[in-house]
Amino acid sequence: EYLNFVADMYGVSEADRKARMEALAERLDIKNALPNLISECSHGMKQKIAVIGALIHEPKLILMDEPFVGLDPIAAHELKEIMAEHCRNGGAIFFSTHVLEVAEKLCDNVAIIKNGKLIAHGTMDSVRGDGSLEQVFLELEDHKD
């Protein structure tokens, strides 16, 4: 019902919603759980449903808060693929993560926010330089206000 509610909010046709729901549910290995109530779902399943809800109306811009938390490794890999496809097709994704390696692998641009303040931003190469994003973060952490 949640996914139909989201699709209704964005005016997604019955045919499009069904096709998108089935395709995304298949990719995220949650197809058999779609008829269940959300309250019956595990945290990982709820996360997958939230991802499908974010994508069902095919937005150009997607905002995600820690989208990989609670996902099994296969679903996390598939979500990374979905995100990369979205960007290759002209979309953009803003997402938060505490796993810097994920940001390094997925992002073209990065912003580091600490205590609500933007402390570094730019292309991945310009922020990272010759080191890793983790090294940059640790250096910024060492130079506290």
Model regions: which residues?
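A short, proline-enriched helix->beta-strand linker immediately N-terminal to the Walker B motif
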Residues: 56-60
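Conserved ABC ATPase "signature" region
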Residues: 4-8, 15-33
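ABC ATPase "signature
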Residues: 121-122
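A short, surface-exposed alpha-helical micro-motif characterized by mixed small hydrophobic
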Residues: 103-105
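Conserved ABC ATPase signature
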Residues: 37-41
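Helical segment within the ABC ATPase nucleotide-binding domain
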Residues: 76-89
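Catalytic Walker B motif of ABC-type/P-loop ATPase nucleotide-binding domains
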Residues: 62-65
